């Protein structure tokens, strides 16, 4: 869907857009190497997670021409700091001191008019199979023929692409932004933007989200507070709901991207803070109240109706309510034999079903469950000093009636 939107966007320009997907006749690796070997220069996104860092590093090493990676991930550039940060507060304080130059350094809205010449692939450089691929109408592609996991169903209530992302952003700004800091705790009235998958796939940028919000509130960079305290509130001098959203888009999102960039082992138990590993190892021998397998988790077959509902939402919709996503992950830690097993299960479920999976932000969420970016709390069985969450406290904190009706036992996985 994103490719279809791109094809439409590029059609009036001099850019020859090739939707890149694997077929039996044209393996992705062969296609990319052929293009690189015919290129004058290669420009690609920099993305610090999943298999992409290794793939792009290898391509850069073997490329016969200049190979550039562009960091357009977040408002605060990954290269602007030579270290990662262990807490959101420490990173927030750092960016409050140093982000000013980047608040006016946004991408050009439409750079395409600068391209003066069009390009048409021909048989001199490409095989007939590739030429057929290049001229393929992506709108007629039969997705069932692609080598992907077809047990994961398509999401019916949302589509990909920039147009859809922009509609969601405008709708959110008109209906959800002004209560973002309050209703985030309501499962029945989720005010979240729903844009995380679109950010992940590059269908919209954090820059556009932030810039549109600034325009809406007639804000400019000169309005920030003069003192960097690391506080989540009152630094932007915007209404509380807007500051809460900016903290998610800039502080938490960029924190995760920078962490993955500086720590290639970001998805492993070994990458966790020492205090977290020590306390969990101290409690490895604790009796778990329940033990579930990956299959039981995947099929929402636990004793907990709230956990099961969250898992059903993930499988059916590719997303999960933000607060329940934290509880969901905490309970996997609670109901497995080791933290390593919990990480493996969380990574599998998140990467398989979440539309925003395989992303630094989602890895931040998984590993926060086990202590990353957090501090030590009161010691408990199994968790040790890892932050503890329960379904009972969630019931008291959140409105769940409609949510449980929507994703209850009759909602099959």
Protein language model features and the residues they cover:
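Glycine/tryptophan-enriched, flexible segments
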Residues: 77, 84-270, 402-413
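A generic structural signal for short
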Residues: 43-44, 183, 298-299
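A conditional alpha-helix N-cap/helix-loop micro-motif detector
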Residues: 22-25, 162, 188, 303
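Structured loops at beta-to-helix junctions and adjacent beta-edge loops in soluble globular domains
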Residues: 45, 70-72, 94, 172, ...
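Soluble or luminal CAZymes and related metallo-dependent hydrolases
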Residues: 2, 51, 161-164, 302, ...
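Active-site-proximal binding-pocket segments
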Residues: 186, 190-404, 409-410
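Trp/Phe/Arg-rich N-terminal binding region typifying the photolyase-homology
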Residues: 1-113, 312, 334-336, 340-341, ...
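A short alpha-helix capping/helix-coil boundary motif
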Residues: 35-36, 110-111, 173-175, 288-291
């Amino acid at each position: 869907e994103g490719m279809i939107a791109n094809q439409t966007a590029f059609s009036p320009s001099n850019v020859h857009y090739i939707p890149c997907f694997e077929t039996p006749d044209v393996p992705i690796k062969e296609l990319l190497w052929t293009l690189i070997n015919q290129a004058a220069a290669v420009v690609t996104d920099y993305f610090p997670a999943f298999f992409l860092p290794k793939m792009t590093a290898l391509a850069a090493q073997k490329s016969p021409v200049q190979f550039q990676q562009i960091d357009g991930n977040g408002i605060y550039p990954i290269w602007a700091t030579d270290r990662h940060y262990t807490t959101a507060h420490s990173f927030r304080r750092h960016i409050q001191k140093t982000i000013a130059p980047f608040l006016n350094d946004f991408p050009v809205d439409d750079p395409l008019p600068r391209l003066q010449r069009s390009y048409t692939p021909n048989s001199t450089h490409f095989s007939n199979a590739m030429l057929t691929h290049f001229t393929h109408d992506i709108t007629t592609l039969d997705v069932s023929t692609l080598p992907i996991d077809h047990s994961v169903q398509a999401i019916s209530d949302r589509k990909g692409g920039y147009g859809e992302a922009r509609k969601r952003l405008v709708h959110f700004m008109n209906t959800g932004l002004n209560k973002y800091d309050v209703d985030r705790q309501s499962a029945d009235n989720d005010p979240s933007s729903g844009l995380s998958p679109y950010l992940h796939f590059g269908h919209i940028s954090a820059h556009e989200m932030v810039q549109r919000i600034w325009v809406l509130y007639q804000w400019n960079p000169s309005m920030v507070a003069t003192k960097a305290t690391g506080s989540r509130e009152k630094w932007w001098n915007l209404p509380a709901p807007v500051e809460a959203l900016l903290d998610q888009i800039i502080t938490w999102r960029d924190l995760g991207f920078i962490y993955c960039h500086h720590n290639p082992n970001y998805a492993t138990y070994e990458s966790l803070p020492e205090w977290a590993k020590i306390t969990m190892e101290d409690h490895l021998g604790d009796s778990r109240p329940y033990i579930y397998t990956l299959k039981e988790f995947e099929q929402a077959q636990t004793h907990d109706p709230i956990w099961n509902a969250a898992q059903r939402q993930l499988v059916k919709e590719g997303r999960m309510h933000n607060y329940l996503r934290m509880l969901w992950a905490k309970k996997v830690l609670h109901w497995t034999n080791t933290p390593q097993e919990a990480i493996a299960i969380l990574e599998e479920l998140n990467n398989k079903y979440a539309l925003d999976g395989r992303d630094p932000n989602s890895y931040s969420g998984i590993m926060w469950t086990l202590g990353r970016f957090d501090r030590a709390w009161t010691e408990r069985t199994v968790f040790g000093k890892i932050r503890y969450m329960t379904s009972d406290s969630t019931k008291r904190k959140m409105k769940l009636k409609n949510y449980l009706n929507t994703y209850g036992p009759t909602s099959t996985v």
